[in-house]
């Protein structure tokens, strides 16, 4: 059985650039998996994916021409049903064998060869046979069809085939199919195309057309030499990155300054999907456009033209940019000039928007927010702005008195005003960023301007937090208003659905409270955020489920940071109000877990909790010394009298490790108490006193964390 390398290529019209990378990876993976499942390729087969604007291809090593035959065990029926007392086949067995294609003449010999095996209930007859292995043509036909059906296609096209009658659905019209097993064409067909050994190279620069492959292994090299195509997405991407660095260095030499292209992985992926043979060129625009905020210029060059703007060593935008061209003419001046002409109107538009926007102050735009609908149940952006401002003022007053309250309120009022500017209307990604520029232009303090930009932060996992306290307050207010508002009208995330990004908002609140160690109790924050909604029709207070939601997100975030589920549960189950304390509590729990006494105390705490849960009425942590009769309960009480003040003092100062470690002295008296003392004494007074002693022990053990959660 011969094994050779396999090459499959589907030649198509230009594929969607933002989807190309995933399409290429999915096509090769699905194709190879199907071949492996069919027994045509070993599990160790090497797979190489190729993807360019006009082709999807896969190279798979060690593919067999025919899959090995597979032993098949067909369970027939119990021996008692299939054979009579003399060992002859019953009519039921003969009928079953006939269904398997075994005629009456051959049945006798087959019956004699049937295998008997006990299936745990009875002896059963099995018919063992060999299933003929699929040929490569059969297996590859199914593999290609399955791979195409499984592609993550953003939107399909329906197009007519050359016969003028048939039509097929695919992401783009397909015009060629290559299927080579070594040097042999595999006779498969898909999308109205029969496989061959020919494809087409670069639309303009191929030196040979069509490109003909003698065997599967010369695919990439032959496409590169004859077709002027770098077929590998990864190799083409690396080549573009290399050329970008080289062109930036060349541009820097011409100006006497070190220049670098912007670092944008998504843009690099996109341009890789737009070209088959990259050629990076240097363009420039007029210096006057640099008066526009560089975020605007960079965005318009990236989003509209797919250019890489060049920055100087300080990160400041220069008037030079890099173009990733798909052609390499001897004289590139026409290509460069064309790109410079195309980008100029884009930059002129940005300058026009910037100049026009600055003719009106941010404050004068605020009134316009009352005409913008935020949510049909929560009113306009103007009403939302008023709620955010009220929440920001209250938080600011809690953290920094009247001065911070005024600054936070002012920033909150202006935070959404840039939504009504021309620049943000054209580029929504610049909301907040443009607000900062316009606030500075209006003469507002830097901390107010920074807060206008930063109140959206953190926008995503790993994003930076607001740079100042005013921005932090407004960002908290903005996210809390969203959370409280959406929960109050029943818009709670379910499963994968989270259209208002409430999980992200919750994590933002958690990060700002924890990483800034803000002295803001969570319950009080939620009550503060709910207050401005009192006049909203149909709003229902939802602080309790929202708190559950936030603590749940907190627990998930902590587990992702590497804390164990037990450590997280021990701390979060106590629902600490100051989230800034949580890292210290977790560190304390981890240190406590390393003590030799920890396991016994955790188990004892769990036992105490279970005892107290069974009591109908709440137990007060009150002990009458006169009712302490047993030596063990007296010893436990004395230990608590000594340990509790130490643990409390450490807890109050925030030394949670010391507070928990003080509990180690309780192990011996706790063990003795449970060995020697009957908690549920017949005397009600004794029983109540012992329960009070346990309640006191339970309270002491659970100040920092519920250490019972550490019990296995």
UniProtKB/Swiss-Prot annotation:
One of its GO terms (molecular function) is ATP binding. One of its GO terms (biological process) is arginyl-tRNA aminoacylation. Pfam families: DALR_1, tRNA_synt_2f. Keywords: Aminoacyl-tRNA synthetase, ATP-binding, Cytoplasm, Ligase, Nucleotide-binding, Protein biosynthesis. The keyword ATP-binding applies. GO terms for cellular component: cytosol. Its main location: cytoplasm. It comes from the Bacteria. It catalyses: tRNA(Gly) + glycine + ATP = glycyl-tRNA(Gly) + AMP + diphosphate. InterPro entries: DALR_anticod-bd, Gly-tRNA-synth_bsu, Gly-tRNA-synth_heterodimer. Tetramer of two alpha and two beta subunits. This is Glycine--tRNA ligase beta subunit.
């Amino acid at each position: 059985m011969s094994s050779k390398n396999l090459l499959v290529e589907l030649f198509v019209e230009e594929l969607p650039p933002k989807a190309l990378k995933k399409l290429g990876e999915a096509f090769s993976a699905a194709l190879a998996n199907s071949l492996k499942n069919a027994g045509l390729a070993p599990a160790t087969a090497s797979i190489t994916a190729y993807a360019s604007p006009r082709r999807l291809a896969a190279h798979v090593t060690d593919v067999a021409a025919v899959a090995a035959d597979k032993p098949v065990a067909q369970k027939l029926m119990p021996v008692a049903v299939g054979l009579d007392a003399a060992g002859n086949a019953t009519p039921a067995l003969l009928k079953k064998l006939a269904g398997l294609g075994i005629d009456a003449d051959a049945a006798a010999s087959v019956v004699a060869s049937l295998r008997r095996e006990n299936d745990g209930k009875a002896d059963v007859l099995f018919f063992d046979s060999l299933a003929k292995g699929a040929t490569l043509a059969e297996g590859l036909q199914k593999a290609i069809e399955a791979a195409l059906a499984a592609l993550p296609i953003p939107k399909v096209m329906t197009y007519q085939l050359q016969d003028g009658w048939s039509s097929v659905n695919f992401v783009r019209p397909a015009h060629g199919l290559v299927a080579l097993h070594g040097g042999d064409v595999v006779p498969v067909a898909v999308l109205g195309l029969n496989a061959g050994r020919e494809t087409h190279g670069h639309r303009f620069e191929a030196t040979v057309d069509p490109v003909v492959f003698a065997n599967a292994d010369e695919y990439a090299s032959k496409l590169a030499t004859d077709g002027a195509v770098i077929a590998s997405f990864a190799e083409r991407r690396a080549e573009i990155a290399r050329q970008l660095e080289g062109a930036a260095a060349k541009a820097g030499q011409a100006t006497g300054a070190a220049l670098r292209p912007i670092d944008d992985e998504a843009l690099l992926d996109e341009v890789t999907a737009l070209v088959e043979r990259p050629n990076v060129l240097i363009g420039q625009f007029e210096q006057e456009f640099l008066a526009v905020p560089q975020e605007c210029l960079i965005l318009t060059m990236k989003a509209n033209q797919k250019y890489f703007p060049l920055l100087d060593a300080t990160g400041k935008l220069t008037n030079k940019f890099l173009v990733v061209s798909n052609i390499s003419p001897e004289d590139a001046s026409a290509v460069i000039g064309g790109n410079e002409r195309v980008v100029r109107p884009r930059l002129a538009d940005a300058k026009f928007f910037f100049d026009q926007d600055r003719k009106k102050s941010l404050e004068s735009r605020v009134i316009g927010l009352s005409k913008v609908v935020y949510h049909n149940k929560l009113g306009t952006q103007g009403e939302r702005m008023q709620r955010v401002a009220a929440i920001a003022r209250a938080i600011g007053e809690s953290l920094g008195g009247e001065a911070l309250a005024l600054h936070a309120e002012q920033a909150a009022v202006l935070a959404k005003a840039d939504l009504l500017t021309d620049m943000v209307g054209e580029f929504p990604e610049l909301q907040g960023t443009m607000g900062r520029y316009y606030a500075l232009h209006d003469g507002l303090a830097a901390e107010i301007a920074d807060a206008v930009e930063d109140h959206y932060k953190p926008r995503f996992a790993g994003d930076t937090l607001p740079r100042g306290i005013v921005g932090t307050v407004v960002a908290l207010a903005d996210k809390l208003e969203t959370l409280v508002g959406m929960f109050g009208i029943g818009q709670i995330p379910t499963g994968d659905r989270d259209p208002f990004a409430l999980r992200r908002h919750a994590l933002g609140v958690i990060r700002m409270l924890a990483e800034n160690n803000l002295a803001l109790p969570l319950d009080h924050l939620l009550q503060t955020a709910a207050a401005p909604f009192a006049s909203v029709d149909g709003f229902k207070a939802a602080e309790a489920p929202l708190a559950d939601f936030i603590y749940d997100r907190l627990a998930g975030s902590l587990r992702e940071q590497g804390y164990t589920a037990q450590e997280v549960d021990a701390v979060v189950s106590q629902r600490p109000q100051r989230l800034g304390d949580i890292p210290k509590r977790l560190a304390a729990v981890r240190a406590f877990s390393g003590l030799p006494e920890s396991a016994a105390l955790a188990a004892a705490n769990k036992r105490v909790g279970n005892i107290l849960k069974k009591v109908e009425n709440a137990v007060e942590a009150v002990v009458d010394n006169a009712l302490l009769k047993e030596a063990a309960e007296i010893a436990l009480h004395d230990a608590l009298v000594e340990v509790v003040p130490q643990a409390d003092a450490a807890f109050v100062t925030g030394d949670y490790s010391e507070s928990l470690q003080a509990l180690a002295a309780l192990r011996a008296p706790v063990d003795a108490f449970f060995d020697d003392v009957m908690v549920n004494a017949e005397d009600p007074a004794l029983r109540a006193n012992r329960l009070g002693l346990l309640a006191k022990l339970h309270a002491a053990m659970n100040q920092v964390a519920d250490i019972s959660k550490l019990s296995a």
